Amino acid sequence: MNSYWAKLPVVKAAMLAHPEAEWIWWVDSDAMFTDMEFKLPLRRYDYKKHNLIVHGWEKLIYKKKSWTALNAGVFLIRNCQWSMDFMERWSRMGPMSSEYEKWGEIQRSVFKDKLFPGSDDQSGLIYLLYKEKSLTEKIYLEGEYYFEGYWVDILPTYDNITEKYTEIEKADGKLRRRHAEKVSEQYGAFREPHLREAGIGKDSWRRPFITHFTGCQPCSGDHNPMYVGETCWNGMVKALNFADNQVLRKYGFVHPDLLDSNTVTETSFDYPDDGPW
């Protein structure tokens, strides 16, 4: 398999190679972690024994029949027999199948907003959910936080989010302490009470967990023509530095300009508190 379908045999191989792992986490090469303190709510998915977690919305599947009703570029899949069997069904729509072209036609007939003719993994997954609603017993559509989020929507929020987190650190001295990466999870727990009013998802000022550069194709450079010039590249630089600042900040450094990866400045010991001490 090639292109986007190549993830399925890779995930299968990881399952077989690591039977001790309960979950396998697939993240596309064009997706970046942009909240370094976030912890996946795995207990939520264990409660009803969901086996596949993807970012998506039921109304876009069953009412609007959109091929963007979910994003198959980032998903959690439980390492179990159900998952192995499901991926086998899913992959039957892929290029190794003799019915590959037929599946492309079926997908376009159901999802009118699908722009290209070939069968793709995302449309295939949505089609299975659309035809078999009972699959939602095992497939969880995560829409409560940015399990992955569209970069065009997220990038403009970075500056406001940074300001909000700076205000939190000004108000709580223990969050300003420099600390080792090893104890970052505990500092995330210290910060959590301050984020209760931040909300989650699209209108939240909480850091987005994953910023997904859908359509940018960073490996091939063959990005969607709707993104002009250096839009994709500049966006990825900004996201990387936004995430990098969260790590550097622990050691007293920061990128003052998110579009400038080369410049790092030292912060005062009690930054962002300006004193007097």
Where in this protein do the model-derived segments appear?
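Active-site-proximal specificity loops/subdomain of glycosyltransferases
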Residues: M1-W23, E37, K48
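Aromatic-acidic/polar surface patches that form glycan- and anion
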Residues: S3-Y4, K64-T68, L76-N79, K114-G118, ...
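Residue-level detector of short, conserved catalytic/binding motifs and their immediate flanks
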Residues: E22, A72-G73, F209
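Hydrophobic/aromatic beta-strand patches that form the interior of the parallel beta-sheet core
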Residues: W25-V27, I53-V54, I139, F209-T211
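Conserved donor-nucleotide/metal-binding helix-loop-beta segment in metal-dependent transferases, i.e.
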Residues: F33-V74, N79-C80, Y100
